[in-house]
Amino acid sequence: MNAKEFLIELLKFKSVTPNDDGALNFIAMELSDFEAFFIEKEGIKNLLLTKKFKDEGEHLAFGGHVDVVPAGEGWSSDAFVPMEKESFIYARGAQDMKSGVAAFVDALKNADFKGARLSLILTSDEEGEAIYGTKAVLEWMQKRDMLPDYAVVAEPTCVKKIGDSIKIGRRGSINGKLLIRGKQGHVAYPEKCINPVHDFAPVLKLLAGFDLDPGSAEFSPSKIVVTDIRGGIEVCNVTPNDLKLMFNVRNSPDTSLEDVKSYVEKICHGLNYELELKQSSEAFLTNIDNKIVQKMNESVQKITHEVPELNTKGGTSDARYFAKYGVKVVEFGVCNDRIHAIDERVSIEEFEKLCLVFKDLIENF
């Protein structure tokens, strides 16, 4: 089957995280000349497809996920019955990221590779906790001395048109929970209470929206963003016993969890508080002079006639795991205007160009 036919079939699998619904088997059969390893951990299914061309040379891998978020209500048609309409294909996962997976498969089938090894790493747990997916496969590969030198993840990176953006890194994510302790009491006797809201009010302006670093050419500043704040028992005559606040920092490599901890401790000095911090993902950056960045940039410009912005914008992705294992990684895919949305769709023209970009990358790597 051709690339579009394969994509349409792939979109029919109801592969809501963490269930692959048979999609991984379907892909393995399409690339039957690749060696297949089904790697399962804690009930999460993953697939490594790999093909050796020669003993010496570079190992190029492609990474992605077949799982999708739930469709929800309000779709114009069944989210798992792909509908082609006005040059678009509508279905859950059309942009995020089954179009990328299908483009990988098409390129791996048809491109002439001059390196040592090609691999495709797929998981059914990227939209969930993402602990036992790509990370588990890379761990498995490391133990067998099979880690790739370079990788491409086909997350939908483009904004307005195919070719306008390549991700060369990602910010990390630090989650924070702050508890300010007080003493509950009658509102008419504030002198007998310790009101944590009053105590924390001057501190809030030092926390909310604060930039922990000035940013750089590649990264925006690491900003503290308050996501939730609450205290009291929803009555007007009782002061709160405590104040709970949650925040997130999308951090660049210039700001660490320890930096966040030090700053919060400094501004909360004198308060009775508890602080909990967790790094849910780490920042990474692939140098713009690295081969994978240069070659991807060349292929994108050649096929799309666009000059892509090399950036680190957006949330986290499984590309961070490749970086953690020392693999030089970039991300490139279709536009992301309908990801996780009702009536998710992908432009057929964008998809066809994506197939050509990946094919060109393989052949000129």
Swiss-Prot record:
It is an enzyme of class 3 (hydrolase). Pathway: Amino-acid biosynthesis; L-lysine biosynthesis via DAP pathway; LL-2,6-diaminopimelate from (S)-tetrahydrodipicolinate (succinylase route): step 3/3. Binds 2 Zn(2+) or Co(2+) ions per subunit. Signal peptide: none annotated. Pfam families: M20_dimer (PF07687), Peptidase_M20 (PF01546). Zn(2+) 1 binds at H65, D96, E155. Its cofactor is Zn(2+); Co(2+). InterPro entries: ArgE/DapE_CS (IPR001261), Bact_exopeptidase_dim_dom (IPR036264), DapE_proteobac (IPR005941), Peptidase_M20 (IPR002933), Peptidase_M20_dimer (IPR011650), Peptidase_M20A (IPR050072). Its EC number is 3.5.1.18. GO terms for biological process: diaminopimelate biosynthetic process; L-arginine biosynthetic process; lysine biosynthetic process via diaminopimelate. It catalyses: N-succinyl-(2S,6S)-2,6-diaminopimelate + H2O = (2S,6S)-2,6-diaminopimelate + succinate. GO terms for molecular function: acetylornithine deacetylase activity; metal ion binding; succinyl-diaminopimelate desuccinylase activity. The keyword Metal-binding applies. Keywords: Amino-acid biosynthesis, Cobalt, Diaminopimelate biosynthesis, Hydrolase, Lysine biosynthesis, Metal-binding, Zinc. Belongs to the peptidase M20A family. DapE subfamily. Catalyzes the hydrolysis of N-succinyl-L,L-diaminopimelic acid (SDAP), forming succinate and LL-2,6-diaminopimelate (DAP), an intermediate involved in the bacterial biosynthesis of lysine and meso-diaminopimelic acid, an essential component of bacterial cell walls. This is Succinyl-diaminopimelate desuccinylase. It comes from Campylobacter jejuni subsp. doylei (strain ATCC BAA-1458 / RM4099 / 269.97). The gene is dapE.
